[in-house]
């Protein structure tokens, strides 16, 4: 049995002058049936609420202010789920709406609850349709794009594959719209991904979406580090999903690492919000990165922010480059007290245990 997550972007769902959003969903849904009939499981992460809301309200360009974005998302989400329900019901498929914000994944308990709910739904042969809850999320609590959200959903359910449907055929060495010599990249191994991502070789943001290729590369990095294969495919070609379901290599394939970091450390790395920052000396940075050590108070040079036990912090080196994230074993007040030599014989106290520390 396979469990796949498919992320459907706004650029796909908006359709064209010849194809409506409903027709796009119909084309997609028909390709799902043979995959599901073999006992496989599917979760969709969908964008499109803001775009549909703007269509409904006759707003010609994507709003810039948060309140209008949230209002159009509220209107559009109703239309979006209505279309999914109408189309999938014709095929005898049941769906469920799941709306998520960053806060829902911020604690380990809520992350696990979301995971259990999603897994139970697919056990019941229901297709969960996930979207960010744009109506209530403020800027601080927004993922801002569903590419990142789709990777976290894939990790939460231990998916075998994440498929990113977009409006380009595959990843390119340069932006193909502006560079005739751009070369397609068919395969990306994890050792290559960070360099490609950091170069930000394309930035194909469109008017209606919030992602672009850069967020898809971030999504691929998150998922592959957690052991999930990622495939980036042109979703405007309705034959492509059939090709994917037949295990054909089209688009760009991102291979997972051989030794995934595990569900818990994936959550620490990518889902949790940090509330403080700890700067390490060079010795502590080396011990954490190369020896898998816990962070001890003796290796701490500076503390920023206020935090209590079990809250998440960003851990950086002397150049302010992120080394890791982790859950602290002591409060910021206690740690500052140690650094200020107000307490003696506490330099060996554990600040972040290696079991709750994830390398960046």
UniProtKB/Swiss-Prot annotation:
Binding site residues for substrate: 47, 134, 146
EC top class, as a word: transferase
Keyword Kinase set for record: yes
Gene3D superfamilies linked to this entry: Acetylglutamate kinase-like, PUA domain
EC number: 2.7.2.11
Tagged with keyword Nucleotide-binding: yes
Residues in PUA domain copies: 275-356
Pfam families, A to Z: AA_kinase, PUA
Reaction equations catalysed: L-glutamate + ATP = L-glutamyl 5-phosphate + ADP
Cleavable signal peptide: none
GO cellular component: cytosol
Pathway: Amino-acid biosynthesis; L-proline biosynthesis; L-glutamate 5-semialdehyde from L-glutamate: step 1/2
Record GO biological process: L-proline biosynthetic process
Matching InterPro entries: AceGlu_kinase-like_sf (IPR036393), Asp/Glu/Uridylate_kinase (IPR001048), G5K_ProB (IPR041739), Glu/AcGlu_kinase (IPR001057), Glu_5kinase (IPR011529), Glu_5kinase/COase_Synthase (IPR005715), Glutamate_5-kinase_CS (IPR019797), PUA (IPR002478)
Its biological purpose: Catalyzes the transfer of a phosphate group to glutamate to form L-glutamate 5-phosphate.
Database matches in NCBIfam families: proB
Protein known as: Glutamate 5-kinase
């Amino acid at each position: 049995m396979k469990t796949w997550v498919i992320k459907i972007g706004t650029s796909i769902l908006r359709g064209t002058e010849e194809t409506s959003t409903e027709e796009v969903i119909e084309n997609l849904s028909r390709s799902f049936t043979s995959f599901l009939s073999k006992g496989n499981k599917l979760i969709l992460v969908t964008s499109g609420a803001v775009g549909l809301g703007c269509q409904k309200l006759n707003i010609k360009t994507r709003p810039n202010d948060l309140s209008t974005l949230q209002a159009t998302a509220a209107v559009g989400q109703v239309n979006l789920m209505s279309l999914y329900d109408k189309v999938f019901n014709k095929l005898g498929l049941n769906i469920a709406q799941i709306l998520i914000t960053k806060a829902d994944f911020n604690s380990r308990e809520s992350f696990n609850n979301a995971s259990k709910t999603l897994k139970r739904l697919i056990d019941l042969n229901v297709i969960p349709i996930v979207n960010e809850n744009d109506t209530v999320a403020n800027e601080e609590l927004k993922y801002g794009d569903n590419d990142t959200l789709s990777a976290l959903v894939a990790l939460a359910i231990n998916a075998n594959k994440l498929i990113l449907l977009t409006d380009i055929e595959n990843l390119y060495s340069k932006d193909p719209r502006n560079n005739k010599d751009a070369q397609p990249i068919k395969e990306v191994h994890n050792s290559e991904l960070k360099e490609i991502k950091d170069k930000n070789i394309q930035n194909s943001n469109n008017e209606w979406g919030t992602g672009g290729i850069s967020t898809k590369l971030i999504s691929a990095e998150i998922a592959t580090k957690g052991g999930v294969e990622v495939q980036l495919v042109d979703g405007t070609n309705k034959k492509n999903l059939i090709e994917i379901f037949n295990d054909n290599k089209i688009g760009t394939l991102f291979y997972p690492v051989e030794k995934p970091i595990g569900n818990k450390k994936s959550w620490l790395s990518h889902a949790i919000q940090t509330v403080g920052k700890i700067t390490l000396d060079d010795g502590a940075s080396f011990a954490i990165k190369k020896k898998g050590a816990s962070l001890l108070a003796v290796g701490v040079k500076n503390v920023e922010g206020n935090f209590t036990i079990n809250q998440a912090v960003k851990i950086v080196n002397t150049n302010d480059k992120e080394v890791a994230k982790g859950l602290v074993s002591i409060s910021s007040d206690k740690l500052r007290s140690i650094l200020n030599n107000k307490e003696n014989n506490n330099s060996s106290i554990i600040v972040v245990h290696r079991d709750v520390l994830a390398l960046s």
